[in-house]
Amino acid sequence: FRRQKLEQYEASCKRSNQDYIFFISTLWSHENCVASTNVFRSEYMLYCHNHPKILFEGGFLIKDKNRQGEVYERLRLKGHIPISAYIDNTKKSLIVFNTPSCWDCHGWKLGEFLAMGKAIISTPITNELPYPLIHRQNIYIINSKEELYKAVDLLIEDHALRISLEENAKAYYREYVAPEKVIESIANKLRDI
């Protein structure tokens, strides 16, 4: 994946007319990913894939040397998805899923999802952020696979909550994550030294 210009993430996109969910991610071999990240991501994909109301597209990007490749083979992404299609399909996706990966970092996805103004279901955020993300305000936090399933069902049915999460995620991005806001925050911290 070669990341695209920020404008592509920030630009609005027409939503799908159906309950379409798109999600691709890397299958990681790092220890915390084997125990948590890969498990949550696979549960999300399988639940969405098997859900009668959802048209799911996606899967894992699995490197041949990944020791867990066989375990998740049924979720292997078939073919290549260009970054432009990844962005467009993520924007069309009714909801998105975030979980920290290697060393519990946020990775690209959290920032991408905020920039796109998506309704985000996420496992707990353990790292410091410029301002906390708040459950049911700008993110939907889950702690178990049962909570994950309930969150998916809730957000495909509760349009008002989903739209509120989308709008507040975009507002959070504009206030705290947009490049000019990050630079401003760094400059303010340097002045305080």
Where are these regions (language model features)?
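Nucleotide-sugar donor-binding catalytic core of glycosyltransferases
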Residues: 1-107, 124-131
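Catalytic binding pocket for nucleotide-activated donors in carbohydrate/polymer assembly enzymes
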Residues: 69-78, 83-193
